[in-house]
Every structure is written in C-alpha cells, then in structure tokens.
Amino acid sequence: MKTDGRKEIRDCLMLLPGRRTGFGDIVVEGDSIADIRLRPQTEPCTTLVMPGLVNCHCHAPMTLVRGLGGGLPLQRWLEEAIFPVEAKMTDEDIHAGTVWGAMEMLAGGTTCVADMYNGKTYPHGFLEVGMRARVCIPGLSIVPGRLEECISGTRSWNERMRGESNGDVYMDACIHSEYLTDEKFCRGLADANRELGRRLHFHCSETKREHEECIARHGKTPIAYLAGTGILDRGGYAAHCVWCTDDDFRIMAERDVALVHNPTSNMKLGSGFARIARAMELGVNVALGTDGPASNDNLDMFEEMHIASLIHKGLANDPTVLSPWDIIEMATKNGAKALGRDDIGELAVGKKADLCIVDLDSPHLVPALDIPNLVVNSMHGSDVVATVVGGDFTYDKSRADGEFAGGHGRMEKAKADLLAAVRRLGL
C-alpha cells in the first residue's frame, strides 16, 4: 500500500501491546506508525483505535452464494449446494464476489485476510479495494499433474505483485485438504517450498468423517500424514482442526502451524468445536477466521470474537477460559504471526499503520468501563467508522465523496456487479 504525508488521530483510546489500553494521539507517516503519544485521559472519549483485524481463513468470492444450502452437513452442503454453482462461475463472477467480500471486510475493520479460492484473476479484487491479502488457489492441488503449474504460477504472480502492491497481495502455498490431494503433490510442493519459503494454507480435520477416513486410508491423522510428507516444514495455517488430537497439536507447535479457529462456520455445519484452549496450552498459535460467507454467513470478525469467547467458556463450564485479551490477540497479532508477518497486528511505532477505528457512542457501547471486554462482547463490525490500511483510509463513514476509496458510486457499482453475477449463475 502506498501513501504520502503525515496523519494524526487525536484524542483516542487505544489497544496497545502488552495487553494495555491507553489514551492519546497516533501519528502516521507514510505507511507506518511514527509515534504514539500517551497522556492521562481527563474527559470522556468516544473513539477507539485498535489494530486492524486479521481474518486468517476466508473464501471471499463466496459472497456470491451467501447462505446457500443452509441446514446441510459439510459434505452434502459442498456436493449438493456449492460445487454445482462453483462449476459455472467465470473469472468475472469470481472477481465480483471478491471485491464485494473485501469491501464487507474493510467496512468491519478487517485489514488483512488469508483467502482461498480458484480463478486466475481473483486476487486482483483485494488489490482493487486496497486490502492486504494472502491468497491461494486450491484447485491446482486437486487435479493430478498440475504441480509445476502451481509452483510456476505462484512464483510469477508474487514477482509481479511485488511491483504492483509492495507484496501486500501475496500468494501462499496451498492444498485444499488431505482428502483432495495426493502424496506426490504434497511431497513436490514441500520440495518447492524449501526454495520459495511460502507458508501452507489448508483445511484440516474439519469433520469427524474427514478425520476418521484419513486414519483409515493412511493409519494417521491428517496433521500427522501431512507432516510426514514434509509439506508442513515451512510452517503454515490450518483451518478448523475441530477433531485434532493432542499429538496433532504438538506437531503443529513444533512445525509452526497455526490453528485458525472458525467457530461460527463449525457450528452452522454441525462440525463440532475446536479445542483451542488445549491447543494453546500445548504451544499452538491460535488465530481467528470467519470462513466463507456461504457457511457463516457474514465476514464480521467482531462477531467471530464474541462467539469464540462464549462457546469455550460454556463448554468448559469456566468463565475464566479465554480472556478478552486472548480473543483480541487471536484476531490481530496471532493472525499476523500465522501469516508470517511481524509488521502488522499491533499498534506500535514502526509497525504498518493498519488501524480499525470504532465509535464508542452507540447505546450498546456505553458506558465503556472495560475496553477489552467491550471489544469482544459488545462490538459489531457496524460500529467501525474507519479502516486504515498502510496509512490509507480505505473505508471512512465520514468521507463526503463515499465511504470507500474511489468516490461516489464505488459501492453501488460493486453491488451491481455482484448481483449481475448472481443472476448469471441462476440463483
């Protein structure tokens, strides 16, 4: 992201590193935080600035099929509702869905996403709206004989994007899952990754059926099987992990594979509950993701934080499980770490100026007695008034020429493009 000049956000509350809150001013120069000037708060404040949220597992183009096939378990949902529609999607359709999904995320304070979908041009949708993205195309891992295409395509894409986006839209390594790829592909991609240094994005142990069928095929869990191919040697981030064992968690901690928790999607599809508190005990980095808008059915990371907090307290019969700060870090710095980034995810001098700015003046946010608790248990994406990516206000409710960068009509055009694609797909 490229920006010029100096910006100041004054008289704001902040979520700071070290699980601290503070009050004062944030100074942005270029694309980074240049200074944080703290001082005592002497009067009420209605502005909170927090790190931009990091959505670590998403399928943004699935805004095209939001809510389709509700009430079906995962395999039937995929085979009966989703795959038949996806088979008809054009690159134009996928681009429209990507742009709309990216805009939804920016409007809710998400500044960076790890997104998985197919289509050669789909990553451009994130670039178009000014959002950071780690993208990957799983389809190449499903069709036999496409390993070289996968490797060369990823290399050429990243070389091109270094110039166009300063590397902020970057392609990671990917397989859809253990059950939709083969050992030869995994070993080949592992060899390539030792040179390319890319992290692996994949689905893992989402359902009991998936987990047990892998054991029946290989005598190993999905994590153990994949680790044996070498494909996890460069680290990565595994979505779901609902049925992972303690031994799986130990492998993940050892190989620097983050667990991306998707509580809403897992509940909607009846998949179960990932044991994230146990994973954390065993040293796994736990991040947060929405999954796609067809299985969530929105991309609101505040809602994801709230649900993640509540379900694990209820399951454990223990209100001390997962503090608000634990949850906030899953949605910010843990997500950045999962993606291999140390320049985002925190409000600190020298970090990229990726900011989520929230209005605290809504009835459900007053009084603001405990800011971390308020963030996790009271806030919604709709409370976000501005989102800053690399120093640029990519979303700003107060902007006279339209909320999104690009002026009046930007959102209307994106909506029209999405609905035209939906009609073409016969939905």
What are these regions (language model features)?
Residues 64-96, 130, 134-140, 208-235, ...:
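Active-site gating loops and adjacent loop-to-helix segments of metal-dependent hydrolytic enzymes
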Residues 1-24, 29, 332-427:
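Active-site microenvironment of metallo-dependent hydrolases
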